[in-house]
From Swiss-Prot:
The protein's name in its UniProt record: Ornithine carbamoyltransferase
The keyword Transferase appears for this protein: yes
Record family assignment: Belongs to the aspartate/ornithine carbamoyltransferase superfamily. OTCase family.
Major localization class: cytoplasm
Species the sequence originates in: Neisseria sicca
Annotated gene: argF
Cell compartment(s), UniProt: Cytoplasm
List of residues binding L-ornithine: N99, D163, S167, M168
Entries under Pfam families matching the protein: OTCace (PF00185), OTCace_N (PF02729)
Catalytic activity: carbamoyl phosphate + L-ornithine = L-citrulline + phosphate + H(+)
Pathways per UniProt: Amino-acid biosynthesis; L-arginine biosynthesis; L-arginine from L-ornithine and carbamoyl phosphate: step 1/3
Amino acid sequence: DQGAGVTYLEPSASQIGHKESIKDTARVLGRMYDGIEYRGFGQEVVEELAKYAGVPVFNGLTNEFHPTQMLADALTMREHSGKPLNQTAFAYVGDARYNMANSLLVLGAKLGMDVRIGAPKTLWPSENIVARARAVAEETGGKILLTENAEEAVKGVDFIHTDVWVSMGEPKEAWQERIDLLKDYRVTPELMEASGNPQVKFMHCLPAFHNRETKVGEWIYETFGLNGVEVT
């Protein structure tokens, strides 16, 4: 939209990390482009690209973090909360091991926000990420709560976030395990009401399995009897 020249390299169009090292790919692309956005799996890949490219490298998504989504989420929360971010509280409920929960935890800590994670303890962010976030929050005045009680997590918040329970590339067999673990962490009207805030708002990075209008949504309904998964 801004008139830039953009090239999209889909996975099958690049030999990065396969027939060509990440370092070599970074050096070549860095000579051809003014910036690189990487959207893939390993955090170590985008960090190595940034180390050798010689141009700005943007993390469009990895398994561990989703910083560009955080820019959008921070802007959205600022626009719709009616108060400064350091006076805003939000919760993330669901599978908290991956990029969205990790990134929201770090984002909230850096911005001095009140951050709650509601998830089974086995699905919490790694101890390393939690420790880093707590250290940052001590400097910014942020608050961090990790709990296995979804209603405790959402009490008094301005926003409730969630994400899919089974990520792209995971086998269908993962659904049964996640549903068993996370059925009490679905974002439902009742959970929204449990916040005690009539103005609470729901956020999801999308796509969301919230009804039967997709092939996956219909399969989940036929297999598990759920009309919507992480959110209804």
